[in-house]
Amino acid sequence: MPLFRDLTILQQKLNGFPVVTYQVGESVLTAGLRTGRLLILKEGAVEVLKEGVQVAAVTEPGAVFGELSVLLDQPHTADVRALEVSQFHVADGATLLRIDPIGLLYVATILARRLASANQSLIELKRQVQTGEPRDTIDDTVEKMELLVGATYPVTAH
């Protein structure tokens, strides 16, 4: 399977990137700032916050942060804060995505999966509204969508 092989190659490349450690409560990314960096979770746990509200907690190694800022050339749209001591592989985002097709494929696959899941949740939400589902059921679907939009999950070989 090509993606599995590419993930193995990507993991080997990640081992060549610097690793940065963040302590509990330390800010990893700050909304409104530009860092130009892609951060790939090596180990630990972080929370993603939008306007001070936690929209996701991420513990999965391989999760990517900062990709939207790099791809759209805009400031970060969320705060990311360490929930426990966390380590990240750090890469210059623009350089990595421009010269490394495997890195680009990895980020594109993550974004495509997130978009597909968000689209499915939107369909579910529309059905719930049309059929008059209870408000708490609709709220659960909205929360699910917020999680999908708030975090970038790693690609795994299936």
Task: Kindly give the residue locations of the regions a language model identified.
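Cytosolic regulatory regions built on CNB/CRP/Popeye-like sensor folds
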Residues: 1-158
